[in-house]
Amino acid sequence: MEVIKITPRGYCYGVVDAMVIARNAALDPSLPRPIYILGMIVHNKHVTDAFAEEGIITLDGENRLEILEKIERGTVIFTAHGVSPEVKKRALEKGLVTIDATCPDVTKTHRLIEQKLADGYDIIYIGKKGHPEPEGAVGINPERIHLVETPDDVERLSLKNERLMVTNQTTMSQWDVADIMAKVKEKYPHVEMHKEICLATQLRQEAVAEQAKEADVTIVVGDPRSNNSNRLAQVSEEIAGTKAYRIADVTEIDINWIKNAKKVAVTAGASTPTPITKEVIDFLEQFDPNDPATWERERKVPLQKILPKVKTKKEE
């Protein structure tokens, strides 16, 4: 069986930056304890488990404001997905030390939205309902930012403002965004369009669209809550025409998916640790459908190998 290692795949710079920021916080004795992450720093349970070993507590819940109310003291880290101005304000009111690990691409979209709001625009925001990135973006001004996820949501809009802009969550399928933006343009011909798919997401989706065509099946390594991982599986099926399965790690591979495959493509979400993906690739490369001894799927990657290394200041 041939394994097609789709390139590029895995970590993006925004994820690595967020993890380094959180790791440095764990190593900084001057920061007040406990140290909390407001939601998952990135959408990968292996990463949050690794941070738990470093003494950083991940708090999750329906929304960021609700989670914040659970924190009485210490330090709070805002995740790569960004937060609303209201969350930042409330954290300061509670006297918490805050560390912002928002992805620069998300920050760029927030600034664009803020500028357009100041110029009198209403915003149509294409995003996944219940995902923290749209929560943070819509939270800038819930009265004038309108979240849509499907063309049907666009149909239900009733906006009178002549000043309209449409933009999007950075990790959406670029094909879905294009379809929904076309629907918005059809309904509101005067709308300004700002496509904000981040470059890392775009390149990974395009790689799957092209390279997965040759495969019998695609394995996407990524957490079930990772939107960009789920979109890679969607791209494989809808654009490349190749059946795809998303797995958190090697233990979730079903032998029935691969036992008759001649070519298996592998990619990984932007928040998937490289050692977790490597373990999947190693398993597939040694897999023999006729030898059950090669079918064992056990995750052996230690948690301390999950997080990126950080430079520590040498004592003088």
UniProtKB/Swiss-Prot annotation:
UniProt-listed Enzyme Commission number(s): 1.17.7.4
Binding locations of dimethylallyl diphosphate: 43, 81, 131, 226, 228, 271
Binding site for isopentenyl diphosphate: 43, 81, 131, 226, 228, 271
Pathway the protein takes part in: Isoprenoid biosynthesis; dimethylallyl diphosphate biosynthesis; dimethylallyl diphosphate from (2E)-4-hydroxy-3-methylbutenyl diphosphate: step 1/1; Isoprenoid biosynthesis; isopentenyl diphosphate biosynthesis via DXP pathway; isopentenyl diphosphate from 1-deoxy-D-xylulose 5-phosphate: step 6/6
Statement: the UniProt record of this protein carries the keyword Metal-binding: yes
Active site residues per record: 133
Residue numbers binding [4Fe-4S] cluster: 12, 103, 198
GO MF term set: 4 iron, 4 sulfur cluster binding; 4-hydroxy-3-methylbut-2-enyl diphosphate reductase activity; metal ion binding
Catalytic class of the enzyme: oxidoreductase
Ligand binding ((2E)-4-hydroxy-3-methylbut-2-enyl diphosphate): 43, 81, 131, 170, 226, 228, 271
Co-factor remark: Binds 1 [4Fe-4S] cluster per subunit.
Signal peptide residue numbers: none
Catalytic activity entry: isopentenyl diphosphate + 2 oxidized [2Fe-2S]-[ferredoxin] + H2O = (2E)-4-hydroxy-3-methylbut-2-enyl diphosphate + 2 reduced [2Fe-2S]-[ferredoxin] + 2 H(+); dimethylallyl diphosphate + 2 oxidized [2Fe-2S]-[ferredoxin] + H2O = (2E)-4-hydroxy-3-methylbut-2-enyl diphosphate + 2 reduced [2Fe-2S]-[ferredoxin] + 2 H(+)
Keywords assigned by UniProt, alphabetized: 4Fe-4S, Iron, Iron-sulfur, Isoprene biosynthesis, Metal-binding, Oxidoreductase
Cofactor(s) the protein needs: [4Fe-4S] cluster
Function of the protein: Catalyzes the conversion of 1-hydroxy-2-methyl-2-(E)-butenyl 4-diphosphate (HMBPP) into a mixture of isopentenyl diphosphate (IPP) and dimethylallyl diphosphate (DMAPP). Acts in the terminal step of the DOXP/MEP pathway for isoprenoid precursor biosynthesis.
Similarity-based family: Belongs to the IspH family.
NCBIfam families, A to Z: ispH_lytB (TIGR00216), PRK01045.1-1 (NF002187)
Designated name of the protein: 4-hydroxy-3-methylbut-2-enyl diphosphate reductase
Originating organism: Geobacillus thermodenitrificans (strain NG80-2)
Gene field: ispH
